[in-house]
Structures are given as structure tokens and as C-alpha cells.
A protein has these predicted regions:
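Conserved alpha/beta-domain cores
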Residues: 1-211
Length: 211
């Protein structure tokens, strides 16, 4: 409901204009409580003998530990997360199209453009896009309304850029995610490179400017 309300506000504010909505991109652990803080709470509750709510916190802690990745940027996120846990993105797409349908019924012109992030191969779109399009059709059928919409892809992995002609068979539009694309092309970490070596590289003429 909260996401649907947010999308409703977006469509209303952008009446008549396309609204590009990127589906969930960050890894799941970014939406979870801080692991160290949660561990402190669990230990404190155990020491004090507090049992109410302890099991839930322990289960959450186990789940967070299970989501740990050595390199989250290149791990389970974007379209990969949508394929492994499709119920998350299906819920998000349903919220988008229910909000769009409700706005249409109120006379607002909506043009949702749903963007699938971190696509690396057209096979990923072949798997996820038909499922999302079925949700769009189902919502419009339930609401007895029709409106324009598109499904597109973010190009932020070098392989996606190289195989863009194949990706374009499914994607109705592209958006270039230049931050991730630059990091993966150069093999640089945006967070670390500037601090550790980019200044030296520019001083030594290896790079004329930061990528």
C-alpha cells in the first residue's frame, strides 16, 4: 500500500508525461537492520533473560547473516534478485500498475515506463519480462481500464552494452547506468579509487581525468 501511494503521487504530479520507475536494484541486506546493532540487542536480551521478541530478533539475525556477500555490487541484486525472488518485484509491479489504473480512472493520463536494472543478457529479460507483463495485463483487466506502458532495461554491465542489439529485442527503451558501467568497465571501485590511487594516476598522466 505504501508503494502504491507513492506511485499514485508520481503519476498525478507527472500527468501526461512518461514516468520511468526502476525496479528494486540494491541487494536485500541494504533494507535490513544493521547486523552489529541487532547482534548487540540479541546479546543484551539474552544476558537480561528477556524472552519477549527474542526469537524474532534471532531469526532476523540469521537471515541477515545469510544475505552477506563478499562483493554485493556484483552479487544478488537487480534483475538477479528479481529472478531468484520474483515475488518481490511482482509485488512492486502490481503496485505500479494498480496506482496507474486508479489514476487513469480519475482522469489522469499515465505513461509508466518500468525499468529492469542490471541486465547482463537478453535471457534474463526473456525470463522476467513476460511475467511482469502478465501482471500489467491482469491489473488492467481487473480494473477494466487500459493505458500505455513500456518495459525497458538499464545498461550498466559491459556485457549488456556489447549485446545491446539482442537486449533490444525485448526492451522497449534503454537507460544507461553510467556509475556501475564505468566501475565494471575499468574495474574501479567508485568509493575507493578516488581515495587510493586516482589522484596519483592523474598526476602521473595515466588518466587525464577521473572516469
Amino acid at each position: 500500500p505504501s508503494q502504491r501511494k507513492d506511485f499514485d503521487g508520481l503519476f498525478e504530479a507527472m500527468n501526461g508525461y512518461p514516468v520511468i520507475i526502476r525496479l528494486i536494484d540494491p541487494p536485500l541486506h541494504e533494507f535490513m537492520p544493521d547486523e552489529e546493532k541487532l547482534l548487540e540487542e540479541v546479546v543484551t536480551m539474552r544476558v537480561k533473560g528477556e524472552t519477549e521478541g527474542l526469537k524474532a530478533k534471532e531469526d532476523l539475525l540469521v537471515a541477515i547473516k545469510g544475505m552477506h556477500e563478499s562483493n554485493p555490487m556484483m552479487g544478488l541484486r537487480g534483475v538477479r534478485l528479481s529472478i531468484v525472488m520474483p515475488e518481490i518485484v511482482e509485488m512492486q509491479v502490481r503496485a505500479i500498475f494498480e496506482a496507474a489504473a486508479d489514476c487513469t480512472l480519475r482522469g489522469i493520463v499515465v505513461k509508466p515506463e518500468v525499468m529492469i536494472p542490471l541486465t547482463g543478457t537478453v535471457k534474463e529479460l526473456d525470463w522476467i519480462q513476460p511475467r511482469l507483463e502478465r501482471i500489467a495485463s491482469a491489473v488492467m483487466g481487473e480494473k477494466k481500464i487500459k493505458f500505455e506502458y513500456k518495459f525497458g532495461s538499464m545498461i550498466e554491465i559491459p556485457r549488456a552494452a556489447i549485446t545491446a542489439a539482442d537486449v533490444a529485442r525485448d526492451a522497449e527503451f534503454f537507460s544507461f547506468g553510467t556509475n556501475d558501467l564505468t566501475q565494471m568497465t575499468y574495474g574501479y571501485s567508485r568509493d575507493d579509487a578516488a581515495r587510493n590511487f586516482l589522484i596519483t594516476y592523474q598526476e602521473q598522466g595515466i588518466l587525464l581525468k577521473t572516469p
